[in-house]
Amino acid sequence: MAVVHLDLYSYELAMNTQITLLLPERRGVPHTSRQGQPYPVLYLLHGHGQDHTSWLRLTRLESYLQNTDVVVVMPNGSRGCYVDGEQSHRYGTYLTEELPLALGNWFHLSPRREDTFIAGMSMGGYGALRAAMAHPERYAAAAGLSTAVRLDQMRDLPRAAERGLAIPPLEEVDRNFRCIFGPENAYESSPYSLKALARQLNDASGPKPRLLQLCGDDDPLLPANEDLAAFFADHCPNLDHTFQIDPGMHNFDYWDQAIRTALTFFGLPHT
């Protein structure tokens, strides 16, 4: 596959930013069966403290998609949680509006909802599920891998550190999240809450993306993911939601396998 490293100025972020893309191996080949059709697209989001190169450097993603006609878009979300923060950058609008428009024009991406998927791990899992539920008209399906369900709370981070997982200083993480989400006591009723968005989407008319939650059985974020899955089961009967627990921790060994489960869920061919 072709790997593209793109630097661009974002009007929503008001700064330069970066994107890594995987382009199909068969692009432009005379005997390809696509004959000018636009490409399906998978937006793939990284976690807190990572960047747009993490999926490509630390998993076998390119190998899995070697013979698939799909474009993978991996934006640099920095530590912005893929939302328009209270006192931070507009990563939500950048992800769901500016980026699809710009890349669609440059890389012949399909604008159709049924060809558009989004996934991510940890902070990116939160961003993927939130984007799909906040903009159900844009995405056919979304997958959250080891989703950081409550990004306003730091309760799971000390336990993660005890297991040897690399995390930034807790004070810095807490300061960053409060700039984005505001006071903790306002979170559950805010537009940042996955539960609030799920309930809103469940009660709304119109398209509803299929949702997948994956988590490792030794992940410190498992209790929060189980709680979110129970909420879907108890309060969102109109949503197509799947929750699956597999062996693994909060690391790329697990996410390397989990992304294949997500690709199968999306109906995207892979090895």
Put a short name on every predicted segment.
Residues M1-T271:
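Non-catalytic cap/lid and distal C-terminal segments of serine-dependent acyl enzymes
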